[in-house]
Regions:
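Helix-loop-helix units of permease transmembrane domains in multi-pass membrane transporters
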Residues: 36-37, 113-145, 324-329, 395-428
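Transmembrane alpha-helical segments and their membrane-interface loop/helix boundaries
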Residues: 1-105, 112, 147, 151, ...
């Protein structure tokens, strides 16, 4: 499709492509240009597209079934009010989950798609064509959001089904989908803006995630610190989650009871305008930012004059016994702006610390944890996601730069390669690990946590750090495409956290009748186990990985129930066993054989 204007069907197959004068003045059929046209034509040809679409609908129905069993169990429900109450509850859960998924994967797909073009040096080829800035930027943006938009439309019948139960109006459903679509465009525009600006994949992913967290955190901070002001009203308008909350509870602010009063027009328009601003800047600066002027910096040299002659001497550095970890630690393998990302994480940590930890600690978030615990949890999850992104890009960058295959010709062993990558990841992200540990120490000094509980919490968090790093390396080695590796790795982390959060909500809802409704949670956990096993055993069908993928959701469920029952040691042990065993199950195959570590096992050769 991209080379279509250069093709002359009248020419012989033995001739080169001929460029006609009219092809230089071509007019694309779509305003996004041939990049989006190609994606729209090729995406439906992939079997994976239909599997993802049907799998997403299946997940929604599993979640709906679990919520129904949690609410009613095996009772014979005949009351209209009970059905309407369940319809409203199910709408709130599904809408919140969909908005969260849409925002995350819009950001992930857009950032990963453009970053892969840069890593493979194919973006420069696009810049050398007669494609305009608008066609490149909008084409990559809309092509990245095509899968997300398909999933949003595919889920519409599920939400319409909830209307038949009562408790939700069709207007609420439409506005909820409008907010989801606008949020997807906003997060995708932000990720595209960052991806065209930054050079390294890790910088792109980390800046995109930190920017989104800072955006949402700033809006919530304005609402919390200046309630009732114009700034708070604008912050509520620009926040996707607050817009969705107003759609879910239209009577919360004393609005009229008619369905026509439900509207999120201001929020949708505001997010679309902000998206247009980000996209417009990217279109205007595309060929200024790319290619980067820093790509062709010469190595450090010094000139010496002897007998009137000038010689240039290149400064060589001493390399360690393990060159992999030396490169990860002693060079700028991930760009020159990594320190800025660490400072941004520190700023986010400071804002969360000020807003939630130093705030009113008596308020319970969803009746589960205090504001201080919720702040720590959010900061820890952000750190784990960034560590995982660092790990998976450490492998995908090598593959895209065609340097991973060169390792086969060297004497570097699999252990040196894998341990070197893991050591570099943990060293480069040491601040992301230390800051939550320091906050745990602050909890102990304030008397919020006992010394015993703080030790359990620190051990559990360090275990999750190792799991996040190893999962990134495992996904990077197991997938041949960088986009698939990044999506699989970060998607697994994201689904684990979202699944845990939803499971905790359902457990609180079914606290009074948990014993009789365990089968509903069993279905939810089994679905998660199947997805995790498929993700972990994509390239290496190891029995240990199958066992780890099957046990991890069940042990996580046990840790959640133990936590809600005020358990401490049991929670720590279940987390260490579940995630520690999974980490070891991913590590051992990677360091056992060099072919396996490079993702080229004998299974691929038949």
């Amino acid at each position: 499709v991209i080379l279509g204007p250069l093709y002359n069907p009248a020419s012989s197959s033995n001739h080169l492509l001929r460029v006609s004068p009219s092809s230089l003045n071509r007019k694309p059929a779509l305003f996004a240009g041939p990049i989006f046209s190609r994606e729209a034509l090729t995406l439906p040809r992939q079997v994976r597209h239909y599997l993802i679409r049907s799998g997403y609908i299946g997940v929604l129905f599993v979640l709906l079934y679990t919520a129904g069993q949690t609410t009613f169990g095996f009772q014979d429900v005949r009351g209209i009010s009970a059905m309407a109450g369940f319809g409203g509850l199910a709408f709130q859960i599904l809408a919140f989950v969909q908005l969260t998924l849409v925002m995350f994967f819009s950001l992930l797909f857009t950032a990963g798609n453009i970053a892969q073009e840069k890593d493979r040096q194919t973006l420069i080829l696009l810049l050398m064509t007669d494609l305009s800035n608008r066609e490149i930027v909008l084409g990559k943006l809309l092509a990245s959001l095509l899968q997300v938009g398909t999933l949003i439309l595919a889920s519409l019948p599920v939400f319409v089904f909830l209307q038949f139960l009562g408790g939700v109006d069709f207007t609420q459903i439409l506005w909820a989908f409008a907010v989801c679509a606008a949020s997807a465009i906003l997060t995708g525009s932000w990720a595209g803006f960052v991806a065209f600006l930054r050079e390294k994949t890790f910088q792109t992913l980390a800046t995109s995630v930190l920017g989104l967290v800072a955006y949402l955190g700033t809006l919530e901070g304005i609402v919390a610190l200046a309630p009732g002001t114009i700034a708070a009203e604008w912050a509520s308008v620009m926040s996707p989650f607050r817009a969705l909350a107003e759609i879910m509870s239209p009577l919360a602010d004393g609005a009229a009871s008619s369905g026509s009063s439900v509207s999120a027009m201001s929020s949708v328009i505001g997010m679309l305008l902000l998206s247009a601003l980000l996209t417009g800047i990217a279109v205007n600066r595309l060929r200024i930012w790319n290619p980067s002027r820093k790509l062709f910096i010469n190595p450090e040299t010094e000139k010496k004059t002897e007998d009137g002659k000038t010689t240039t001497v290149v400064r060589h550095r001493q390399i360690w016994a393990n060159p992999v970890i030396w490169r990860e630690i002693m060079t700028r393998a991930y760009g020159r702006k990594v320190i800025v990302l660490k400072l941004a994480y520190l700023v986010v940590a400071s804002l969360l610390f000020y807003q939630l930890i130093l705030g009113d600690s008596e308020d319970q978030f969803l009746g589960m944890v205090s504001g201080a615990a919720f702040a720590f949890t959010g900061l820890a999850i952000l750190g784990l996601v960034l560590i995982n992104a660092q790990a998976v890009t450490a492998i995908s960058n090598e593959r895209d730069a065609k340097t991973l295959d060169l390792l086969v010709a060297t004497d570097i062993t699999a252990k040196e390669f894998v341990y070197g990558k893991l050591g570099g990841v943990l060293f480069n992200t040491k601040e992301l690990t230390l800051i939550p540990v320091l906050i745990i120490g602050w909890f102990v000094s304030q008397g919020t946590l006992t010394l015993e509980d703080s030790i359990y919490l620190a051990i559990g968090y360090v275990t999750l750090v190792g799991f996040a790093a190893m999962l990134g390396v495992h996904s990077g080695l197991g997938f041949g495409s960088s986009r698939q590796a990044i999506a699989n790795s970060l998607g697994t982390m994201f689904f684990l956290f979202v699944g845990i959060f939803v499971l905790m909500i359902l457990l609180i809802e079914a606290r009074s009748s948990f014993g009789t409704q365990i089968q509903s949670f069993f279905v939810f956990i089994v679905a998660g186990s199947l997805g995790l096993v498929a993700s972990l055993t994509h390239r290496n069908p190891s029995p240990a990985l199958r066992l780890a993928g099957g046990l991890l959701p069940f042990l996580t469920f046990y840790s959640i129930t133990s936590f809600l029952l005020q358990g401490t040691l049991g929670v720590c042990l279940s987390v260490v066993v579940a995630y520690g065993f999974t980490t070891i199950a991913m590590l051992i195959p990677a360091v056992s054989e060099f072919d396996v570590a490079l993702g080229r096992s004998t299974l691929d050769q038949g």
